[in-house]
A protein has these predicted regions:
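Membrane-proximal helix-turn-helix segments that form the acceptor-binding/catalytic region
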Residues: 29-30, 56-93
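Helix-loop-beta element that forms the nucleotide-linked donor phosphate-binding surface
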Residues: 85-95, 101-122
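Conserved donor-binding/catalytic core segment of Leloir-type glycosyltransferases
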Residues: 131-148, 154-157, 173-176
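Nucleotide-activated donor-binding/catalytic signature segment of Leloir-type glycosyltransferases, i.e.
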Residues: 187-220
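Acidic donor-binding loop of glycosyltransferase active sites
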Residues: 224-246, 260
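Short acidic/histidine- and often glycine-rich active-site loop of Leloir-type glycosyltransferases
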Residues: 257, 266-281
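Conserved acidic donor-binding segment of nucleotide-sugar-dependent glycosyltransferases
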Residues: 276, 280-287, 295-302, 316
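A short, well-ordered alpha-helix in the C-terminal region of glycosyltransferases
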Residues: 296, 303-317, 329
């Protein structure tokens, strides 16, 4: 590549995106005047871990858990130093939310002029009317693996039917999305089978629908066949040792694009994403709080239409063509700075 002919470089950074991180570091060292920009998907950090642990911590890499995890924590000050070193030389860093921008700026020690917020872009999807209100159709959409809080959603739904048995015949839940084998199978066996067992134990078999490994072209149709998306995410307790994750969610962006409201935990930056009248939040891990939110939407169905209307407005404002214009402006400003 003839880097003298390049006006600006842009990268996508997130947890584990180490090739892009190392490429930016190399470019910064070799071409210190070249404008560098990046979208940071998982603030308050850039990549959260090093590609390789330094010696002698590297000895622990091939050992049994928890030794590799302990080594990662011990090496984190070095990783954080490298992240800050690069971040402070970046011309512009884009985050998807204000909360993400603030957390990244504070943790990396950045100047306000380096920061830009551009909401998660989405496809321009034709609006579709809400389906008939009975039954109320809830949707979990996203990868189906441990740590997504799906058990909380199942427990909350069972709690709703215990407290208000009359609602049982009026609500259905669909679990839709990808089930990557390496994520769905762990040391304790198949996660999908564990979910199915839990569903049987809770007496919910007749109320749960499955849409696994959904083809991309069917996503809008499936989302719009439901009333509300439910995202019960929990933040990783292991990750908290390294920092606060303040990213957002592709699933939440799909809900916005398809004009559907969301009930979500307050994990990540979700509270900001549903602060536009397009849904409601509850404290992550609070099963009773989620159950209360579900009862709320069952007993106040008019909110579903209100949320859908607000989500549709957001979706139209966030179409990729508008997002591209925002990035074009960022790139132009980055070139002017240098």
């Amino acid at each position: 590549v003839d880097w003298s002919a390049v006006d600006v470089v842009h990268a996508e950074l997130g947890g584990g995106r180490l090739a892009e991180f190392q490429a930016l570091r190399a470019l910064q060292r070799r071409f210190p005047k070249l404008p560098l920009t990046a979208t940071v998907h998982d603030p308050e950090r850039l990549v959260w871990r090093r590609e390789k642990l330094p010696w002698p911590l590297s000895i622990a890499s091939g050992m049994r858990s928890p030794l590799p995890e302990m080594a990662t924590v011990l090496a984190d000050p070095l990783c954080l130093h490298e992240e800050r070193q690069l971040a402070r030389h970046m011309t512009r860093l884009v985050t998807l939310t204000q909360a993400g921008s603030q957390s990244l700026r504070q943790r990396m020690g950045l100047k306000p002029a380096q920061m830009e917020v551009i909401s998660h872009g989405n496809m321009d999807i034709a609006p579709a009317p809400l389906p008939p209100m009975k039954p109320l159709r809830l949707l979990y959409f996203g990868f189906i693996y441990r740590g997504k809080g799906i058990e909380d959603l199942l427990d909350a739904l069972a709690s709703v039917f215990t407290e208000k048995p009359a609602l049982r015949s009026t609500v259905r839940l669909t679990l839709a999305g990808g089930s990557e084998p390496e994520m769905a199978f762990g040391p304790s066996g198949s996660y999908l089978e564990q979910l199915r067992l839990r569903i049987r134990q809770l007496g919910l078999v007749d109320l749960i629908d499955w849409q696994l490994d959904l083809p991309a072209e069917q996503i809008p149709q499936v989302i719009q066949a439901h009333h509300v998306m439910v995202l019960p995410y929990r933040e990783s307790s292991k990750l908290k040792v390294l920092g606060k994750l303040r990213g957002t969610s592709g699933a939440l962006s799909w809900a916005v694009a398809c004009g559907r409201g969301v009930i979500t935990s307050d994990a990540r930056s979700f509270a900001e994403e549903v602060s536009h009248g397009n849904g409601m939040i509850y404290p992550q891990g609070d099963v009773q709080g989620l159950a209360d939110a579900l009862v709320n939407v069952c007993t106040h169905p008019e909110r579903i239409a209100q949320w859908a209307e607000k989500a549709s407005l957001m979706g139209r404002a966030r179409v990729w063509s508008h997002t591209a214009e925002r990035f074009q402006s960022v790139f132009r400003q980055a070139c002017e700075v240098h």
